[in-house]
Amino acid sequence: MSFTIRRATHEDKSDWLRMRQGLWPDAPIEYLDFDLDDRLADPDYAVFVASNADGQLVAFIEAGLRDYGEGCETSPVGYIEAWYVNEHIRGQKLGKELVYVAEGWAREKGCEEMASDTWLENETSIAAHLKLGYQEAERLVHFVKRL
C-alpha cells in the first residue's frame, strides 16, 4: 500500500482531531482541540499527515522545538510531541517514514538531536523508538499530593 506524507493544513483539522482521539482516547475533546490552529501557525512546530491511496488520512506526527530534551547535549532539540498510525495499517513502515520526515524538519531548523517520550507501559512505542535508533535516556515517575 502506498502513502503520501505532507504538511497538515487547516482543512485537515477534523481528521487530525479524530486521530488525536485515537492516540489519547481518555483525553477530553476540548483538550485535544484547543490548540490545533496555534500549532499549525507556529513556525517552531510541524504537523505532518499521511494519506492512503484513497486520500484518507491514516497517520500523523507532531514535532516541535524544545530548549531541552532529556539526555540531549545540544539545543534546540527536535521533539516528537505526538505520533500515531491507524492500528489497521501498522507494520507497513509508515510510522518510520513519518519519523524520518519529522527528523528532516528538525535538521532544517538547526537541530542536531531529536527526542521523544512515551508512557512506561507502552511497550509498542518503546520498541518502535528503539528500532528507529533512539536510545532510552531516563525513566520518570510523576507524583502528586492533594493539599
Where are these regions (language model features)?
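Helix-loop element at the rim of GNAT/NAT acetyltransferase active sites that forms part
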Residues: 13, 17-31
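Conserved active-site alpha-helix within GNAT-family acetyltransferase domains
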Residues: 96, 108, 120-138
